[in-house]
Amino acid sequence: MVPRLLEYIMNNIKLTTRKTHKEKMLGRMVGISNAMRAAHIDIRKMLFRSVLAEFGGKMRMIACGGAELDSRVFNYLDDLGFNIYQGYGLTETAPILTIRGMFVKSKAGVGRPLRDVRLKIDKPNEMGEGEIVVKAPQVMIGYYHDKKATNEVLRNGWFYTGDLGRIRKDGNLEVVGRKKNVIVASNGKNIYPEELETLINYSDLVRESVVSGMKKGSGIQIVATIVLEDKYKNCSTVDSEIEKLIEEINANLPEYKRINKYVIRQDEFRKTTTMKIKRGSK
């Protein structure tokens, strides 16, 4: 399952509890459950059985991949008893390299490498961020009849993923974005569009968004193109609500990462078969 579907599930649960005036009650139940979990007593399946019953009542786990799942979505659903396993990998790695949830209980990142997977960060910056490179038995031997493309990603037995990430203190890999999507600010620091998009997409107003960098004078202007949820498209106050959202996001960001402008788009972005937005498409 791709992260966007889990976001949809979370938003629908929130909407239902809000409509039925059970939001506060659910919050209290989560508080009780988490206190019990801290004492190694898990009552989630019993406490939230009415929520889980909406998904058949027999769901053991959800495997999530295709992109990193927002930790807030993971935490929300985990609190309600959803067992989510987040994986990371590529088609070229057949397809999994790390996993979080099955043996690793961290609520951030995409987990630790599987057995026999060697993973490192190439040329890390001062934040420890660099390209994720791997060496493992499941890595492809090359692209069919394309030696040039093969040589670009396979070097000295290591596969260069094109993804940027860092290793957290708990040993989990955290993916911060795609190398080709990075926006370089005027101060030379990296801005990862995916990070800003996650913050924007967390709002109930927003269906999806794309953040890009546009030249303005000698600097870069950060622009967010936003697709609203259908029910808000004709809302008279939506512009002021989006402005407020951007202000709240910017308040917690360093100046070079702040969103300078937003554009509301009517049509959804074109997507790949794995529901990833095709950047640059109209």
Language-model-detected regions and their locations in the chain:
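Conserved C-terminal "lid"/linker of ANL adenylate-forming enzymes
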Residues: 210-213, 247-282
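Conserved AMP-binding/adenylate-forming
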Residues: 39, 43-173, 179-182, 197, ...
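AMP-binding/adenylate-forming catalytic core of the ANL superfamily
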Residues: 136, 141-142, 164-253
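Generic structural signal for well-ordered beta-strand positions
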Residues: 128, 168, 174, 191, ...
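Soluble, non-transmembrane catalytic domains of enzymes that act on hydrophobic metabolites at membranes
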Residues: 1-7, 12-14, 76-79, 101-102, ...
